Amino acid sequence: MSAIDSCEHTVSWKLCEQKYNEATTLLSKLKKLLGNFKENCTSVVVDGHKKPRSESRKKYDAKKQHQSSHFATPVKGVESSEPTEKKKRNKEALWLRARQKKWKEIFELCQKITSLLGGTILIDVSFSMEKDVLTYLWMRVHYQVISFFKHRIYEASTQHDPELLSSLVTMHIQYLNSTIQFYTTLIAIIGELYHLQCLSPLTSFFTSCVTPKTILESPLRKQGSHNWKTSTNSQSRLAALFSSIFEDSCLEVDSVKRLLSGSPSSSSSPLKKDSSSNSLTYEPALTDHKPQYLVLCVYRSLIYIGDVHRYLAEVRSPNVPDYQVSRRYYVMAANVAPDYGVHFHQLGLIEVADARSSSRKSSSGQSSSLKGNVNVEDKRLIQALPAISFFFLSSISPNNVAASSAKTSLFIALKRCFGKTNDGSNPCLYHKESSAISLFLRLYAIAFSNTDADYIQDSGPLFKRVRFLLSESLKSGLFSESSLLQMTYCALAARVLAPFIGFSDSGEHGESYPNLKLATQTTTMFFEVLSDSVNSQLPLQALTSGVSSKKDGNFDDLVERRQYGSLSSNAVLMPMLLPLCVLTSSCLQNGDVWLTKDIRTGLSQIFNRLSFFLENTNQTAPDDSVLVRCSSKSIGLLFFFPLVKVCGVPRDTLQWLYFSNHYPFNEEGKGPQVDDSDALITIALDSLYVLLNMRAKSTPNSTSFSSPPTPHRSPFSGQAFTGMGLSNYSLMSSSSFPSAQSSPTSPFLSGTPSIANQSSSIASLQFGRMVDSLVGPVQPIPAQTTGCSVHSLQQRTFSNESPRAVDSGFSRTSTPFSESTSSYPLVSGNLSSCETHLNGSPQNGHLQGERVLFRPLRSPALNTFSTPATEPPEHLVLSELLKKMVNISNN
């Protein structure tokens, strides 16, 4: 950095400090105004004295009722009381005008503070990173005022004062709309000002949506400024965007410059006036700005916009709120930074609220994920499956705040899986009519709760029942694709969280060994049944019949279409493909030492059969570009798929969504609708083959699919983000999170300290209300040295040490999780898949005696088992015989 640049950076830093200190001073004034406004809402003036509004309202209603009940009979004193009532109404009108005046002061003060703090983000990114300005702005200004109005509206609704309630709702909606406008315009300004290539599709979308309306309503255009007429389109957009959200820039273009530069000679101003052309010219705001922080600002803004739309939905329709718009912005955030995990938690909160207030959906049968008849309790658990899966995903995210908050929400949601029985009955008991999903969740609820060890010992029959129901439901095609994906997310996340059940504050493992075994065995059982069911749908006849060389012209040109014959119409196979893709992606990035022999054998057989099919039908193998399109089918796929990311952003996915005019960028909020079922299953099969092929190439033995164990790291640490340069500020505000502090009955006894109020979060989930916790500032994450890449963020979730053990220096030489789950026999009854060596060590090496089916001829030779040099390899002989069988059947 040159001396001039250093001087300019010092000037911009001091300017930001000045604005930050001024905004901090105004916050005390805002707090005082809110207190006065609260007093105005809760009291009225009677005879020159303030009295509680509830008491005054009761007396007024009682007198009106007395007059109406005796309207035919003259009542003594009624005529004389009319002037008094008129005076009281006049005083209330004066009080109402005073309230409106105070609200105007609050609104203008909030705009001024927003203008000061928002300007620092654009003046000096380094300063905003150190102070975490965006979180500070949301927590101390926007969320504080929103929470204030939510409480006042609730109090007014209990006081039966329609006039006060109507005025408060109007003010609340006005403030929410202004907050949405600020964050939406901030995203457009960041994209227009810094030209982030990784976010160009998203920022282009916001700029195109925000700019036309902003330019038409801009004061610069209304005043007919000469600068406006001579400026370029980009400069016009910037000027209009600045003038729409910054109070100081609503009069002249020079005020925009003063807001961002602070002095006429500063060259760090993004907007500068050219004396020759008398127009605005663009200059970079900083030479050392951090793109990672700007990406995080965009991500946070999307989360905040989704939160505000959630509050709007609650105000407009308290009984049955529509969270569709909020869900749309959370999905946008997932496409920007899928590894941050906050969007999963917010989506889980929405699913909890929808499950509470969706009686009409359950009555129509649309919320059920099974095609059979299930009882009311099963329907309730099926409705809870999306929320539990989102909480599971958020719990394993590298974001400390999101993970610790989601663990509490997850525990509360799993407790509800036990039903309404509080008589101490055995939770392992079940009804024969119970569905596979409800019992599947029941197993994890038992494992992740402080259930008596005797109950866990009795879980053998329940375990076998779940295995049987899963197998029968998969083979019968009773599961939908979304249900299987959600169950897959639960299974993978539960395996990650299982080693952390029962850790004490000292880092020592408590009596949770049975819980650990039950959680891990449930996960392995699920994937064993899943892989076996997929193999049963891939027989030789299905892989060789019905293949046509005709190419469908209606198929998307972005992905080359392959012909899969009769598999394209297999409705039973289709829902099981994406869950296997998720499993393969997880093992590809984080290791697969936990896989049992049956899972490894099943995956190798699926890969061999698909390879044989493509080889013998003379079709080109798909490439990894198909993963971009496949990842748009579920936001959980973005979290697991090995997509190319720039600053944590899957840019290819954003580009495909933007240029394809698909969700979440369209206003209707509808996903990419593909009516052709052949196209859907083709994408899924291509993605599965690509992932299995990548996994085979990344391991020395393509059949065993073994990989070295995952490094010992804490899943809830911030190490993944220090590699991005994001260690000096908090990753995300927890304004809308339930408490991060584990409850006394929670199985997670350690973790990140809580900064939220626990009681309100529990009430939020128990009573179905979206009550956000009032929290303080987020503690920054200490910087740690790491060499990880952005692409391996999820790897932090696979760990053998507790968070408390990492912080205190305590390390365990060996843990149950460090070994394969196949080394543990079932608690009650052994499974054939749980095989071990005589010495108890797991079989993570070559699979002895495994038969490789449908191996393509030109594939590399396998080293699974040794053969004499004089004999040809067995898989070549088998492939030749299979090919002759195919030729005979065709002739």
UniProtKB/Swiss-Prot annotation:
| Chain residue ranges for the region called Disordered | 48-86, 795-822
Major location, coarse class?
nucleus
Superkingdom, according to UniProt? Eukaryota
Q: Does the keyword Transcription apply?
A: no
Q: Which organism is it from?
A: Schizosaccharomyces pombe (strain 972 / ATCC 24843)
- What is this protein's name? Uncharacterized serine-rich protein C2F12.03c
Basic and acidic residues biased stretches: 48-64
Pfam families with a match to the protein in the record: EST1, EST1_DNA_bind
Q: Which GO terms describe its molecular function?
A: telomerase RNA binding; telomeric DNA binding
Q: Which GO terms describe its cellular component?
A: cell division site; cytoplasm; cytosol; telomerase holoenzyme complex
Q: List membrane-spanning regions.
A: none
What keywords is this UniProt entry annotated with? Answer: Nucleus, Phosphoprotein
Task: Specify residue ranges for compositional bias: Polar residues.
Answer: 810-822
Write out the annotated subcellular location: Nucleus
Q: Please name the GO terms of the biological process aspect recorded for this protein, alphabetically.
A: nuclear-transcribed mRNA catabolic process, nonsense-mediated decay
Q: Write down which residues bear the modification named Phosphoserine.
A: S261, S263, S265, S268
